[in-house]
Amino acid sequence: MGAAKASLGRIFPESSILFLCDMQEKLRDRILYFPQIVSKAARMLKVAQMLEIPVLLTEHYPQGLGPTVPELGAQGLRTMSKTSFSMVPPLQQELDKLPQLQSVLLCGIETQGCILHTALDLLDRGLQVHVAVDACSSQSEMNRLVALARMQQSGVFLSTSEVLILQLVKDAAHPQFKEIQKILKEPVTDIGLLGFFQGKKNSLLPNSRT
């Protein structure tokens, strides 16, 4: 097993886990880009299962917010219910069973709430956190973008589902690459993030103005 260097953010199937956060029925009509982010989280789940990466799923106050949406494809997974914004407290025992764990791949909602709190708690544990930005969203675009910036300030790696999947596979000679390639062929749509990353790029340029 290769050791992941924190400065590089490399990820390996044998030392990674996928967190799926609170993609529930009652949030369907409240969250920006909900179908798109669930679709990207679903392909993360498919690839994680193909590569035998552990997956943990939570539901936030399911009595009020309902069950996980079926299109995520998580019907066979054990679901942990929670009231804390962070996923870490209800999943603590599961994490303790994985001494080899180095990297957490994080998808779900809401970015400024449960995703941010989960990411900070995981960083506190000394884990690398990789947020799939195309698989996370919020009710408010401003809260979503500010939360992404806040996580990046704290050391979270911002990525996309495809970037993470290709990091995990690493080689077109991988025995499952052709199947994974089929999963990646769905069209990519803008979900409001191009401006965020364009702004990041401009902030690095001399004499740039916001």
Curated annotation (Swiss-Prot):
Keywords carried by this UniProt record: Cytoplasm, Nucleus
Residues spanning the signal sequence: none
Record InterPro entries: Isochorismatase-like_dom (IPR000868), Isochorismatase-like_sf (IPR036380), Isochorismatase_domain (IPR050993)
Location in or out of the cell: Cytoplasm; Nucleus
One matching Pfam family: Isochorismatase
Cellular component GO terms, alphabetical: mitochondrion; nucleus
Modified residues (N6-succinyllysine): 178
Tissue: Ubiquitous. Expressed predominantly in uterus, stomach and urinary tract.
Subunit structure comment from the entry: Interacts with CDKN2A.
Family, as annotated: Belongs to the isochorismatase family.
Alphabetized PANTHER family for the sequence: HYDROLASE (PTHR14119), ISOCHORISMATASE DOMAIN-CONTAINING PROTEIN 2B (PTHR14119:SF5)
Protein name: Isochorismatase domain-containing protein 2B
Source species: Mus musculus
